[in-house]
Amino acid sequence: MMGATSPSGLELTMAVPGLSSSGSEGAGCNNNNAGGGCNMRDLDINQPASGGEEEEFPMGSVEEDEEERGVGGPHRPKKLRLSKEQSRLLEESFRLNHTLTPKQKEALAIKLKLRPRQVEVWFQNRRARTKLKQTEMECEYLKRCFGSLTEENRRLQREVEELRAMRVAPPTVLSPHTRQPLPASALTMCPRCERITAATGPPAVRPPPSSAAAAAPSPFHPRRPSAAF
């Protein structure tokens, strides 16, 4: 780990393979090496720095890291330490504008005592984290929608099965005399109206009128001629 001081007074740290810093940092790395390696503390740029007055964030962009890693093998990105005041001003500027113009970038760099490139990289990292957070929220929302739609699909499938069962099964017809359901063998379908009715025997033949009824005098009495004629 090599340390350097920028013209603005900020300390820049850069990891170099095969070298380690002296003092307490070197002792900390040695202790960590005994446990499995020396790892730098990762900080969330969305949250203020905790436990200290400074915050670190990668200086280089993703493209730069890939180029340096391809040329010189494994590479650890450089870190820039920001104070709480600098982090607060950067967050306020990001809430106002997610993208800065060259003039805004230059003015903010002068105000924060940073280089314009450092401000640009910070905004790139901040936009990437915002996009990642938004993607996670959209993924969670789509998962909930998928679950509700799956449950609705199952409910509709159950309703379809119930309707099919009702369509196949014969309808229940009650007897007009006993009010009990008639068996399926006793049901017939009217060919004209296609309605299921209870099976009945042949139509009853009406008895002919009796002879007594035929011989009964008619209640109509014709008018007799008058005696005057």
Curated annotation (Swiss-Prot):
Tissues with expression: Expressed in seedlings, roots, leaves, nodes, internodes, flowers and embryo.
Main location: nucleus
Keyword Transit peptide attached: no
Gene3D superfamilies noted in UniProt: Homeodomain-like
A UniProt-annotated Pfam family: Homeodomain
Subcellular location: Nucleus
Biased composition regions of type Acidic residues, renumbered to the chain: 52-68
UniProt xrefs under InterPro entries: HD, HD-ZIP_Homeobox_LZ_Class_II, Homeobox_CS, Homeodomain-like_sf, Leu_zip_homeo
Keywords, comma-separated and alphabetical: DNA-binding, Homeobox, Nucleus, Transcription, Transcription regulation
Ranges that cross the membrane: none
SMART domains: HALZ, HOX
DNA-binding region(s), chain positions: 75-134
Signal peptide as annotated in the record: none
GO cellular component, one term: nucleus
Disordered: region residues: 1-82, 198-229
SUPFAM superfamilies recorded: Homeodomain-like
An annotated Gene Ontology molecular function: sequence-specific DNA binding
Region ranges (Leucine-zipper): 133-177
Function: Probable transcription repressor that binds to the DNA sequence 5'-CAAT[GC]ATTG-3'.
Family: Belongs to the HD-ZIP homeobox family. Class II subfamily.
Complexes and interactors: Homodimer. May form a heterodimer with HOX1, HOX2 or HOX7.
PANTHER family given in the database record: HOMEOBOX-LEUCINE ZIPPER PROTEIN ATHB-17 (PTHR45714:SF8), HOMEOBOX-LEUCINE ZIPPER PROTEIN HAT14 (PTHR45714)
Protein's recorded name: Homeobox-leucine zipper protein HOX3
Organism: Oryza sativa subsp. japonica
